[in-house]
């Protein structure tokens, strides 16, 4: 059975534009992603306004703080019943366990961010991480699996390695950094939708290629057609 893997990233602080896109993409994408830019501008009420359009929400806040702070923040966010919420796996085991406890009873699934797609080997070394992105993602995916997170966020470059170790029942793979050409913007580890799906992705986070398109609906349809044989 075909499952729509597209999550459209609404990386904007313009709520009217976000509402317009969400209504336009209703029934055509699996979720819309709201990030820190939107949440800082509009908070819980802004997220609720988008949710009222009927499209499931992927709230990408990448929470990373001491366990108690993250736990209390999630207790507040849980009332929104978003589909997925991100935390940083590098926040550690205790932080993730407390986060899982706080989300208990909610429909929200916790997803762990591993290595940002804006980072490469040299960036990791600058912050004291000597492993390659693949090695670091594998280390963090193991921790995420042990804690019981629903899935992880990783680039398509690491997805194949993770999928070779863990089945879809173990960890869902949410893959950002999806591009169609050489325009990578501020991301370094990027691949096409088809390549990401073949690597084992369950969800593709796609922003600018859709939101900056002259015809977002047609762009989504084109993406779905390009990956239909990979599902």
Curated annotation (Swiss-Prot):
Family to which the UniProt record says this protein belongs: Belongs to the OMP decarboxylase family. Type 1 subfamily.
UniProt keyword annotation of Oxidoreductase present: no
Family matches, as Pfam families: OMPdecase
Protein name as annotated: Orotidine 5'-phosphate decarboxylase
InterPro entries according to UniProt: Aldolase_TIM, OMPdecase, OMPdecase_AS, OMPdecase_bac, OMPdeCOase_dom, RibuloseP-bd_barrel
Enzyme class: lyase
Lineage top rank: taxon: Bacteria
Record flagged with keyword Lyase: yes
Pathway: Pyrimidine metabolism; UMP biosynthesis via de novo pathway; UMP from orotate: step 2/2
UniProt keywords, alphabetically: Decarboxylase, Lyase, Pyrimidine biosynthesis
UniProt gene name: pyrF
MF terms in GO: orotidine-5'-phosphate decarboxylase activity
Known catalytic reactions: orotidine 5'-phosphate + H(+) = UMP + CO2
Active site: 62 (proton donor)
One CC-aspect GO term: cytosol
Matches recorded under PROSITE patterns: OMPDECASE
Biological function: Catalyzes the decarboxylation of orotidine 5'-monophosphate (OMP) to uridine 5'-monophosphate (UMP).
